Amino acid sequence: ASDVYKRQDQLNAQARHALMGNLGIQYTYADEDRVEATMPVDHRTRQPFGILHGGATLALGETVAGLGSMILCQPDEIVVGMQVSGNHISSAHEGDTVRAVATIVHKGRSSHVWNVDVFTSTNKLVSSIRVVNSVMKKR
């Protein structure tokens, strides 16, 4: 398994100029079974009505599950997303910060399945997301 999760500051710095940085996503915890990150509900992640955009929520879910799978992979492997689906249960409003908690459901040789729950700052469940990642050998 990779020790990438031990370098959260480095991961957050690298993400600054990618989708994660554009959405304000910050990793806050990571180990081989769980990854957590936060994302602000602001002009970058909200709908015109001032609530969290479902697409931004799914991007947050895929981000934490992707890091989780990277942690589980060997140095000669890469991870790509295969499937993301989510149920949006309640809303988060502009000015809040949501927290994603990804937990591993299946650690297979060629695929990983993650459950990601997204909460408001008051621990209200916003979305429940399922992510399937494919594990492949580097070419």
Regions found by a protein language model. Give the residues of each.
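Short, small-residue-biased leader/transition segments that mark boundaries at the very start
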Residues: 1-5
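Intrinsic-disorder/low-complexity, polar/charged segments enriched in Ser/Thr/Lys/Arg/Asp/Glu/Gln
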Residues: 22, 34-36, 83, 97-99, ...
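Catalytic strand-loop segment that frames the active site of acyl-thioester-processing enzymes
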Residues: 22-52
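Conserved GNAT-family N-acetyltransferase fold
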Residues: 39, 61, 116, 129
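Active-site helix/loop of acyl-thioester processing domains in fatty-acid/polyketide metabolism
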Residues: 55-75
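Beta-rich strand-turn-strand
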Residues: 78, 89-115, 119-128
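A short acidic/small-residue loop/turn micro-motif
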Residues: 106, 133-135
